[in-house]
């Protein structure tokens, strides 16, 4: 079975083809980073227009990469939410139209389920059950996962997501968009311990997060200590250490409360090397395992949508003739497969 996956939830156009026997056959990705850089963030209208320009050419490129034609595709999966409504509508409209034209099923996919299942694309995929840390620009959630669609929300950010806090703090440090990866690079040159940031909400029970205060703390630290290059690097290091430690502490609590031995990390921030190293060290001490996708599958991509679409199709999920997207869509609302 071959599934074409279409991802257009934000500022990446991702197209991929997944075969349930051979694995990933094609993966095409176009990033709009340069388009939005001058604005310091994603401009929804510009994102939608660029998806219109890029989606069909990338589908053609994916078919060529895989050596396939339209007649070889058994289903079309597309991101139906959450995300930017205009961007979602582009991918959903193209996906639904192609499915109708090719006389194959259309499969709406939850963007965050795509991220959650991305580690399944690797040679050593995790087995159920596990605790999932979904950490990106729009979400920071801890989820108990006992099967496909069997998701229990354990905790989430009550304000900024971790990735959003990275980007906002990077902007305070004078870094360009997207700031998260640039902040991490700057942090690698920083001196540990010169500045100490709080670890929000770790001094109380529970698994929720709060990162907006770290941005304010960073702004005050920058204002009080000047902005020479080394000081900025030291502040970046302190900020990253605070976020990573907070995520690690909450993951440890989630593992203790569930009794699970496996931790899955997914989403754009899961590509952070410091976070990966700290969680790997923690899980080794706990005699458990940590799983994550390769870096190119941590950020938005079509491969995770194609894979999640295949899983959902085998569970009997298909779309009707309408084109429906959900900019807000709780993961817990998905049915079990």
UniProtKB/Swiss-Prot annotation:
GO terms for biological process: tRNA threonylcarbamoyladenosine modification. It is found in: Cytoplasm. Its cofactor is Fe(2+). GO terms for cellular component: cytoplasm. Fe cation binds at residues 111, 115, 300. Keywords: Acyltransferase, Cytoplasm, Iron, Metal-binding, Transferase, tRNA processing. One of its GO terms (molecular function) is N(6)-L-threonylcarbamoyladenine synthase activity. Binds 1 Fe(2+) ion per subunit. Its EC number is 2.3.1.234. Its main location: cytoplasm. Substrate binds at residues 134-138, 167, 180, 272. It catalyses: L-threonylcarbamoyladenylate + adenosine(37) in tRNA = N(6)-L-threonylcarbamoyladenosine(37) in tRNA + AMP + H(+). InterPro entries: ATPase_NBD (IPR043129), Gcp-like_dom (IPR000905), KAE1/TsaD (IPR017861), Peptidase_M22_CS (IPR017860), TsaD (IPR022450). Pfam families: TsaD (PF00814). The keyword Transferase applies. It is an enzyme of class 2 (transferase). HAMAP family: TsaD. Required for the formation of a threonylcarbamoyl group on adenosine at position 37 (t(6)A37) in tRNAs that read codons beginning with adenine. Is involved in the transfer of the threonylcarbamoyl moiety of threonylcarbamoyl-AMP (TC-AMP) to the N6 group of A37, together with TsaE and TsaB. TsaD likely plays a direct catalytic role in this reaction. Belongs to the KAE1 / TsaD family. NCBIfam families: gcp_kae1, T6A_TsaD_YgjD. This is tRNA N6-adenosine threonylcarbamoyltransferase. It comes from Salmonella typhimurium (strain LT2 / SGSC1412 / ATCC 700720).
């Amino acid at each position: 079975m071959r599934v074409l996956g279409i991802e257009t939830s934000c500022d990446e156009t991702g197209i991929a083809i997944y075969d349930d026997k051979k694995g990933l056959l094609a993966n095409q990705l176009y990033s709009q980073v340069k388009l939005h850089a001058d604005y310091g963030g994603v401009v929804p209208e510009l994102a939608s227009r660029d998806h219109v320009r890029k989606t069909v050419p990338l589908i053609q490129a994916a078919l060529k990469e895989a050596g396939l034609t339209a007649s070889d595709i058994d289903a079309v999966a597309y991101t139906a939410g959450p995300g930017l409504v205009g961007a979602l509508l582009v991918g959903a409209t193209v996906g639904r139209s192609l499915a109708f034209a090719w006389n194959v099923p259309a499969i709406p996919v939850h963007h965050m389920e795509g991220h959650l299942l991305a580690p399944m694309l690797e040679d050593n995929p995790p087995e159920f059950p596990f605790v999932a840390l979904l950490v990106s620009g729009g979400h920071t959630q801890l989820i108990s996962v006992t099967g496909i669609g069997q998701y229990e929300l354990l905790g989430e950010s009550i304000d900024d997501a971790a990735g959003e806090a990275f980007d906002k703090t990077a902007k305070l440090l004078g870094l360009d968009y997207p700031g998260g990866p640039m902040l991490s690079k700057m942090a690698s040159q920083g001196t540990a311990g010169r500045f100490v940031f709080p670890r929000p909400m770790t001094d109380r029970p529970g698994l929720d997060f709060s990162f907006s205060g770290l941005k304010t703390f960073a702004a005050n630290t920058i204002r009080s200590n000047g902005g020479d290059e080394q000081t900025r690097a030291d502040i970046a290091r302190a900020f990253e250490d605070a976020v990573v430690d907070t995520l690690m502490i909450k993951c440890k609590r989630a593992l203790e409360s569930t009794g699970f031995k496996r931790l899955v990390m997914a989403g754009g921030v899961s590509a952070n090397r410091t976070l990966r190293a700290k969680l790997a060290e923690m899980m080794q001490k706990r005699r458990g395992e940590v799983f994550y996708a390769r870096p190119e599958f941590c950020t938005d991509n079509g491969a995770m949508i194609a894979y999640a679409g295949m899983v959902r199709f085998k569970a009997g999920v298909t779309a009707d003739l309408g084109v429906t997207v959900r900019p807000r869509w709780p993961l817990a609302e998905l049915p079990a497969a």
